[in-house]
């Protein structure tokens, strides 16, 4: 059987309106798509399940409402065949911890999404609280990685300290601003001793 005959699972996707300051309207439009659009694109690529977080909970940078985004996703995802949810935790929004506590018990929620860049915090300062929370719930954690607040090597101590978590470093090859050193995620995984650090493409 050809590998292309197997349905895929996309563990890192978003739905909603993309807005990056400094991007053209066309770039923002091309990166946008409602839940139905995301599923339609996935189907064309033989992707059976797509795990999403809402862009409204991440963007615009430093101004997104993660709590409102989580509520939106908890409504939209169960109604959209082919989608599953990451619940977003923003350490600056205490209510997102409470939402995660509740949503992690739902069959459509696969784990926790962290985005230190969009929520403007260094993972080195907030990682212990975030990963202790995740470890207590044995949660999978998808993290943006490769930029100033989210260097892959900065996640390694938390993955080591909290082996109950499974941590996915997003953006294989992102060494900063979608450029830089393309080996940073791989080197962090090579240094891991607990076998709980992964990467997505």
Tell what function each PLM region has.
Residues 1-129, 133, 137, 191-194, ...:
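Mid-domain alpha/beta scaffold segments of enzyme catalytic cores
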Residues 110, 121-201:
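Catalytic pocket-lining loop regions of alpha/beta-barrel enzymes
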């Amino acid at each position: 059987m050809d590998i292309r005959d197997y349905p895929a699972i996309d563990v890192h996707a978003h739905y909603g309106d993309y807005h990056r300051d400094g991007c053209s309207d066309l770039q923002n439009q091309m990166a946008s798509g409602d839940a139905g659009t995301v599923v339609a694109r996935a189907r064309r690529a033989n992707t059976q399940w797509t795990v999403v977080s809402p862009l409204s909970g991440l963007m615009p940078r430093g101004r997104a409402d993660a709590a409102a985004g989580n509520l939106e996703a908890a409504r939209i995802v169960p109604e959209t065949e082919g989608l599953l949810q990451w619940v977003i935790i923003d350490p600056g929004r205490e209510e997102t911890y409470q939402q995660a506590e509740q949503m992690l018990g739902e069959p459509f929620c696969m784990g926790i999404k962290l985005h230190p860049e969009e929520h403007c915090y260094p993972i080195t300062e907030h990682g212990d609280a975030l990963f202790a929370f995740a470890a207590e719930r044995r949660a999978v954690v998808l993290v943006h990685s490769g930029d100033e607040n989210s260097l892959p090597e900065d996640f390694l101590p938390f993955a080591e300290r909290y082996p109950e978590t499974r941590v996915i470093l997003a953006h294989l090859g992102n060494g900063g601003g979608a450029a830089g050193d393309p080996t940073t995620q791989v080197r962090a995984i090579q240094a891991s001793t607990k076998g709980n650090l992964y990467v997505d493409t």
